[in-house]
Amino acid sequence: TAGSGHNLDASWESQSLPIGNGSLGANIMGSVEAERITFNEKTLWRGGPNTAKGADYYWNVNKQSAHLLDEIRKAFTEGDQKKAEMLTRQNFNSEVSYEADGENPFRFSSFTTMGEFYVETGLNMIGMSDYKRILSLDSAMAVVQFKKDRVAYQRNFFISYPANVMVVRFSADQSGKQNLVFSYAPNPLSTGSMVSDGNKGLVYTASLDNNGMKYVVRIQAETKGGTLSNADGKLTVKDADEVVFYITADTDYKINFDPDFKDPKTYIGVNPEETTKQWMNNAVAQGYTALFNQHYNDYATLFNRVRLNLNPAVKGVNLPTSQRLKNYRKGQPDYYLEELYYQFGRYLLIASSRPGNMPANLQGIWHNNVDGPWRVDYHNNINIQMNYWPACSTNLNECVLPLIDFIRTLVKPGEKTAQAYFGARGWTASISGNIFGFTTPLESQDMSWNFNPMAGPWLATHIWEYYDYTRDLKFLKETGYELIKSSADFAVDYLWHKPDGTYTA
């Protein structure tokens, strides 16, 4: 893991079960002794215009380099590539560091963890058998099962899109077997406080140290049998038959914000204390069964649209996925495994990209660190496009809408970038983006990756693809066409005539 030294354990990525609803994401580790759940809310980001140096420090970063284009193009046509390269390296970057420790305060931004949950079970591995972890792609539910001392234990995990709540149930086939201690470890680069919400709940309210972004995490437990106590920021359950934990979270980030280059709080517009309170009250009122039914019906409407059937599966259909992978690497054909991977990709997109929040980032929605590889940002040079290549073609058109909403927030800053660097109309983006409308190149002079002026037009192709599949003329008229046209304006102005009359970029 790149970046900060906090929490470098990579097991969450290679060994956990990922669940999500496009806003909340979690990774289920499944330990018998203490369940560990990494937790994310997709709009919790460091950086942006509200750091200590304010909006101008964040927005006023474009170099006025357009006047050099003619000189660079002339050098190219005369074969002086060294001069063209030098001018490009020196003038088509910015002073914005991509590394969190490269400037103070860090302004580019990074997706950051909302912390982790731990549930101590009072159990140990002695006498444990029949251990299983299951990720059901059909129901978007993670399950942990095992037996110990002739008791069958089960944990169920899902995150509901309609309710915006994560639901965690601990149960067993014998009564009085749940003895649990639930605790929360927040983002270490934030300042906050935990308070009790009655006897059953906890509320953690905090803000990130870097930019003051406010976030709230709410937890509530409901038990059958036994006792429940709430003290010192922990929920303690004794001798219960069943325990259901409801968890929700939000930040003060406003989806589809309209960038104001003078207002450092331009992206703020939500009260997470109120939103999380409403979600929690609604979830608890519904209860586990009703929430799961609602969750399943919502998810299945998307997932069940497509069935992939390749050649009849070879022997080994009932083997664990880990064993199937080992066999596959040895050259054994397994069409069912290929079908499974196809559907797993659809599952991950549904889990990380739903209307009403940001698009899937470099890690979808899952992250266990305060910083991460490539800031866990939006890489506009192919990665974000790759996330959405299978969206429409696998009948998940709705999952593209967060990407289109994200593109809309790039237009105003992207117009400034297009004008400053290329003297062009329209808008464009650069190599990396974030949730705060960043469209400028970074400080590196390595133009093999930092020079990416066609990022905007590439993003715009996804807008056309969405229309091409949906034939939603209302969308095209009200939203899509202007975004595409403005991107095309940039592309037209970016082209230039070589001396032989041919257009080139």
Named regions from a protein language model:
Residues 1-447, 465-467, 474-477, 481, ...:
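Aromatic-residue-lined binding/catalytic grooves and analogous aromatic/hydrophobic interfacial grooves
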Residues 452, 494-505:
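Aromatic-lined, polymer-binding surfaces characteristic
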